[in-house]
Swiss-Prot record:
The lineage of its organism: Bacteria, Pseudomonadati, Pseudomonadota, Gammaproteobacteria, Pseudomonadales. Keywords: Cobalt, Cytoplasm, Magnesium, Metal-binding, NAD, NADP, Oxidoreductase, Pyridoxine biosynthesis, Zinc. This is 4-hydroxythreonine-4-phosphate dehydrogenase. Its EC number is 1.1.1.262. A divalent metal cation binds at H167, H212, H267. One of its GO terms (biological process) is pyridoxal phosphate biosynthetic process. It is found in: Cytoplasm. It catalyses: 4-(phosphooxy)-L-threonine + NAD(+) = 3-amino-2-oxopropyl phosphate + CO2 + NADH. The keyword Cell inner membrane does not apply. The active site is located at the dimer interface. Belongs to the PdxA family.
Amino acid sequence: MNTQQRFALTPGEPAGIGPDLCLLLAREAQPVPLVAIASLALLAERAQQLGLAIELLEVGPEQWPDSPAAAGSLYVWDTPLAVPAHAGRLDPANAGYVLETLTRAGQGCLDGTFAAMITAPVHKGVINEAGIAFSGHTEFLAELTATEQVVMMLATRGLRVALVTTHLPLKDVAAAITAERLQRVTRILHADLQAKFGIAAPRILVCGLNPHAGEGGHLGREEIEIIEPTLERLRAEGMNLIGPLPADTLFTPKHLEHADAVLAMYHDQGLPVLKFKGFGAALNVTLGLPIIRTSVDHGTALDLAGSGNIDTGSLQVALETAYQMAAATSGKSQAAG
């Protein structure tokens, strides 16, 4: 790991637990320079509320750190709030602040200031209440980086699950499983497992759409007409794709033992298993971006903000994964050079 590579951390919704997570994390030293892109005033006030003695070290374009902060301290690129934020109380006036932190982090990753960005949860509803159309981090960063197609992947120790479709009603899923979509998603998953995770020849298990993967066409024909022919074309490109497999048996130790990732057809086919296996220690990764972005797998938890009664496990895993991805990417760049 290059201990001089800087990483950006965005705390998300200022009334949620994101600022708390940043401060609690700062109690221990990180192996790299980690920069919170946040309001200094917000972090100072929340630290006082939590009873934490964290030294906030202001940094920015004029002076970036090139070594990790000591335990009990946190680098902060000050990004002012529009109005004061209070734990647990949403205010649409600060929607612009949230998006500014994401923009600074994303642009910093594009221009090389940061090796990766790690995001704490935002509150989509309050941003939309401010009159700003916002459907989530993923779509915002895709637009910021001019990326046409991105893929959502959640991961925990020992399991990665990517999705062909994401937040769709179940009744719309089958129509959305097209050969074109499946090809795009699989290619992105395969390419990023190689480029950002350092896996030379990824082994990907692919779920069927229907029960028993269609039971030879008796329980649905999508496997026969769309999924299998598409996988055959992709195998001809050199991809190691296993499936389509019945989802109820795919997620067993025997199948997963040598798998680098699972490709699920829809949200609730793959994510319940992952969250059962690693809830509180799982993360979200956006694949297909020209930058590295990882995130926690939970929400803003407004009721817990300022209480100190929160678990940093998901954020810690998101950080560790970002560090590993940056190291893999840096290693490939150096080899190419």
